């Protein structure tokens, strides 16, 4: 990762031990979650309060306006002490580096954390050193969900690890009945570029160069064009449906209605599928002609505001949040601690094992575009527009990507 920031040093003499001065202290914790996930976080906060008498954790649920509200808080000097974080380059100047805490007497043993998570929470400083700005709280990799009942009805064997996109397309063609609006595979009509980069990586490409300086030769590389062409061909041929556009509905609705045989996603839809009583299976991602498969990681981390008035208490909360007790309470994502995943038998559970198995495929050398250039947010808007054009026009893909690369490069330098 080449995103560069000035390092911020922690003050010496950190008070790590339980502190009587914390009595009657309020710690503000901001989250983007809602519903069941929010209730889990409130339960973790309550457990922390019980272990730290006199401390109140004020859980602030910002919801869909998370980034806007968080940025406003930082700008007004009224940021929460602890917050959910993912976009470290954008917020780095406002976040407290945690390396001194990690190495201190009241540090955190990172050996139990699942491999591949920590690079997502580090930035590179001007002097070439790196700073850890967050501690992983939960994650998901990307896998393939398949509808077992649809496979059974079509007389098809279930997908297995090591399969390819050719295998997936062959199954999709046999599952599809376009005249009945039944499809073998679901293509996201408006994907998050962050998630979509999984496909580019697996075909040997990416959105941006390793040094983060250009998208030309990457966003518009032949390997990138091939990925988009494949999805367009699948939609045109009736193998796949472009979900989330027009009246096609969401992939969850289609899957639950037995109108969709396969879809690639993270852990998020699993509770919906289970609540709907679906008979489904989970398998790893297919490869592009035997090339190494790579999955991006949807990860949430906890960070501390640089200007927090109670950084030591905030660290205690972050550390508690990463404890086996708290991690085990997070039942709606994959545990960040190997010991918790093992204790829950997830590595042997056919519905969860593929998520864990995909994590080593989250190669630290393939860091997401937003970690490679602090201006990626502006370039991503160009990429999003290009993806939408490709799926609307379904032609001239290379020209669309060439134009997008030229405009994205300008956005990177603004």
Question: What spans do the regions from the language model cover?
Answer:
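Hinge/lid segment of periplasmic solute-binding proteins
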Residues: 87-141, 199, 283, 348-351
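C-terminal lobe and pocket-closing loops
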Residues: 103, 269-279, 289-385, 413
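Short, solvent-exposed loop/beta-turn-alpha elements that line the ligand-binding surface or hinge
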Residues: 100-116, 161, 183-185, 205-226, ...
